[in-house]
Amino acid sequence: MKKHLCAAPECTGCLACLNVCPKHAIGVTEGFLGEILPAIDEDKCVDCGLCDKICPSLNPLPMYPSMDCYAAWTKNETDYVSATSGGMATAISKSVISKGGVVYGCAAHGLQVKHMRCATMEDVEKLKGSKYVQSEMGDVYQALKKDVLEGLTVLFIGTPCQVAGVKNYLRQEYGNLLTVDLICHGVPSQQSLHASLRHAIRDIEPTKVTYLSFRNHVKGDFCLECRGLKKDGKPFLFERGIDYSNSYYPTFFFGNSYRNSCYQCRYAYRQRISDMSIGDFWGLKDEKVHREADNGISVVLVNTDKGTAFYASMQADVHSHRQPVEDAIAGNAQLNAPTRRTGRTRCFRFLARYCSFETAFRITWMDRILKSRMKYCIKKIIRK
């Protein structure tokens, strides 16, 4: 591998370039935090230029101002209870499946998080839950294009940069493709997650991880949970909330461990790349809606005529309350600007170039770690 495409700090890792290359001349390398970066093998490259033509960083797509905003949640009680917000990703996916379409979304397979094709309601169950890590796209591009060209209704759900990758890969608009982007704060690499878990769970066997979850309403909403078998065959259960006893959540929630491109994200604004955008409705002011929904509420931003028509078609499946678009924008930082590089973030990223993920975390957050441990010790003494 001898050269990169767009500048590495601008690369979103969508890998549309890798999938479009007719000579398989593009492979993958890793940055210092494990983020995936495409690299061209010049011995195989024939300079056809396809990779340059479909790169979203080199060829920006038009963005859409949100037309309507809704506070919404699914009417399916089972889906609502197991949802990490209002269950709207599941509701939209099931609506597409019920109409004979297919869905491409993100699922956890052990410790591997990747996009997959779903053609049944049972498949959609695998997509449930937030994944605070960048998913692998794999060969999703080719499969999605085949479905689109065959005339199936196709739903793609992903981060805005993944949506941009899909759109540029297809190179034209298709009426039977519906895109939904997740309002995104930034994505750490899967290697960052693995490094954090390897430190926390001694002798973890990645191939024998049976369950991975990033949110759990019963256990305090934001809870990193991992279950499986160690190398010696003994079972383990790992659970951590947003505290400083584990490195993953602090570095994620405070924006230390994202891709470089996340700090200059062109999609972290009120103009959106997709037909619809969904996420947590942090800025909701309607108290009546708060009282009506007891588990979680999604924000649904409808950005195109196609999105409007589809959302109207699924009203029987959801509770939906129109809200001012400005409420959603005011309450969600990532609808206003990309995540900032704070002093701690700069410190963490500098250290991570020269030492392990865990060491960089412990040095960067030493004051908070010590404070957290002191609180724990004091509480333990008081209980006695």
What is the meaning of each model-derived region?
Residues 3, 10, 16-39, 49-66, ...:
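Iron-sulfur cluster-binding cysteine motifs and their immediate structural context
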Residues 101-103, 152-158, 177:
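Generic beta-sheet signal
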Residues 9-24, 46-58, 159-165, 258-270:
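Local cysteine-cluster metal-coordination motifs and their immediate loop/turn environment
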Residues 84-87, 110, 156-166, 186:
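Gly/Ser/Thr-rich loops at beta-strand to alpha-helix junctions
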Residues 178-200:
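Short, flexible loop segments at boundaries between secondary-structure elements
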